[in-house]
Amino acid sequence: MDSISQTVLSLLRAVLWKEEPSFPEDTDWNAVTKELNMQAVLGVVAGGELPRSVPAKVREQWEYLALIQGMRFYQLLHAQDELLALLNAHGIYPVILKGMAAAVYYPSPEMRAMGDVDFLAQRKQVDEALTLMLANGYELVEEESACLKRFRELRNNKHFLMQKDGHHFELHRYFGVLDLTAKMQWMDALLQEGMQRREQTLCCGSQLPMLPKLANGLVLLQHAAGHAQGGIGLRHVMDWMMYVHTCLTDEFWQESFAAAARMLGLENFAKVMTRMCQLYLGLPASASWCCDADHALCGQLLHYVLEQGHFGLKQSNVDERIKRLLSEPKSIGQWLRLLQLSGMNHWEAAKKYAVLKPFAWMYGCGRYAHLALGRNQALGRLHEEKQEGDRRSKLLKDLGILLGEKQVFWMGDQFVEHERK
């Protein structure tokens, strides 16, 4: 682990658990700030009680950034309140997913970096909620790329992405990224039933409709697992850690959570991620249910999280894109579909002339070859990247969260398994 990552982890432990931090004398604080941003946890550090050993200029910069984040948090909270008031006035009572429903577990909710307002409505009310929002100034956000357009058509609107006054909202028809119909049906039934027993939680002066703690915890766990293949960062880990600290006692684990996580194939992932938090992020070891987690896997998962960044933000360079591409198992059919979609997404001529569409896969093949081979020592690097991709695949497989060729989607009026690409 490099010194920047060590400093980031030390800061998080100091702010959250009051551990005495230890920083190298030559710490590159600009690099630390960048890493905190790329992991989407700057607010957690800046919004807490900073150690005195952090230089004054850095403290001032972080405190200013924390103020900006806090302002955005309350703006989003107000927008969420307006949406809930609109829906409730018309007999629609959704629950908030992730976002504020994760922030409530933090010492100060505004410490958490926020994105969209995600909410789940009862299936029979989704179309009504969509129509109501469209009639009240909310607009659908258009998907631009061919890949995203096809994916949206395939999943038959897993969620509707909308915007108003600069804020984004996701109206979910269902939630989860799973590979077996039985798993999805079980989780969906739990969430739909959970909406009938939603809990009102006070968050920064606003009433927050949430799923019961079992269902809400599974949403946070599945959210991290679902994004793992594309890249998860410390914010996903923090959401889970703060939930565990607040809710997931040994008794709760044994009575209900373990069986539920096992049903979704996420029991080992839950144990490893929690034990990782205890070993490296300072989570108190009061929860003993994860003590049998493989410590080697904990270290590998931490390395992966630090390497990826928030939603894979640190994968933006060509080397990382090639590693991720090579880490995902694909059949010949999947490779051809991937190349075809890449070609349609980047070949302007194929977008303009229909006669060229059948040959888009060839353009996609050339594009990937150019990316992979147009580098110094390309063949040697490809070999190393293939090895790294294999290691990533093995890690996700050992954690039980490696997605196979199929993914479950909602089609018509039922869940079905369909090839992911």
Mark where each language-model region is.
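Conserved NTP-donor binding/palm subdomain of two-metal-ion nucleotidyltransferases/polymerases, i.e.
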Residues: M1-G115, A121-K421
